Amino acid sequence: MSLSITHEKSLIDNYIWILFDKSKAIVIDPGESEKIINFLDKNNLTLEFIFLTHGHCDHTKGVFSLKEKFPNASLFVPIGLELGLGESIIKEGDELNLLNSTFNVLELPGHTDNHIGIMYKDNLFCGDVLFSAGCGRVGSNYKDMYLSLKKIKSMDDKTKIYFSHEYTLDNLKFAHYIDPKNKNIINYIEVFKEKPDTVSAPTTLLLEKEINPFLRLSENIDIKNKINNEFDAFVYLRKLKDKFNSI
């Protein structure tokens, strides 16, 4: 039996992911706690497990209150993240059986040097590594982020991508700037014009291969200054995106 998956919007543009069965729940990246507790209480759910993909406060701040209310909930964190809450470290290759379901851990450094992703069936919870039509800012080094995106790109096209921020419209504007004739990008922008509050998560890997410039490096290989390899193209695009709003 598959777990149900839903989200709560958090802070300005965060998504907190909740997976649950009839009585128990798993929470991923709780940037705040009140909405999560309300959801759990409303649905008579006990919080059993918490995952953190990385240590930024907009993904972790709610964990302290959640552990106060649910002290028996197990907390899983990447290597190097110490919160003093009895957390368990998880790493690449770990397989966890939770709520009669299998979860696999992927190391996806780049946004932070210890960032992880969580795979449940064909669902990837990727934190701040990949967004729809974009990717996270580089906080460790460009090579790490490039390789993490390549790892995701190698997955099955049917993979559902559960990212942690609703940046899609801004990302699409940059994608259109880079690839102005891409009809898939143009059509997706129209969706947001018609429904500005569109929730774009989860996306699919297939869609991202059509619209996301950071997964289309071979298509963008000769942009602007005739870059001739994918890694340099990635670095160029990521730096350009960092200053795009001022262009």
Curated annotation (Swiss-Prot):
Against CDD domains, the record matches this protein to: hydroxyacylglutathione_hydrolase_MBL-fold
- Organism of origin is Vibrio vulnificus (strain YJ016)
Note the SUPFAM superfamilies from the entry.
Answer: Metallo-hydrolase/oxidoreductase (SSF56281)
Q: How is the cofactor bound?
A: Binds 2 Zn(2+) ions per subunit.
Positions that bind Zn(2+) 1: 54, 56, 111, 128
Keywords noted in UniProt: Hydrolase, Metal-binding, Zinc
User: Which GO BP terms sit in this record?
Assistant: methylglyoxal catabolic process to D-lactate via S-lactoyl-glutathione
What superkingdom heads the lineage? Bacteria
Q: Which family does it belong to?
A: Belongs to the metallo-beta-lactamase superfamily. Glyoxalase II family.
This chain's function reads: Thiolesterase that catalyzes the hydrolysis of S-D-lactoyl-glutathione to form glutathione and D-lactic acid.
Q: Quote the protein name from its UniProt record.
A: Hydroxyacylglutathione hydrolase 1
- What does the subunit section of this Swiss-Prot or TrEMBL entry state? Monomer.
| Residues bound to Zn(2+) 2 | 58-59, 128, 165
Q: What class of enzyme is it?
A: hydrolase
Q: Name one GO molecular function term.
A: hydroxyacylglutathione hydrolase activity
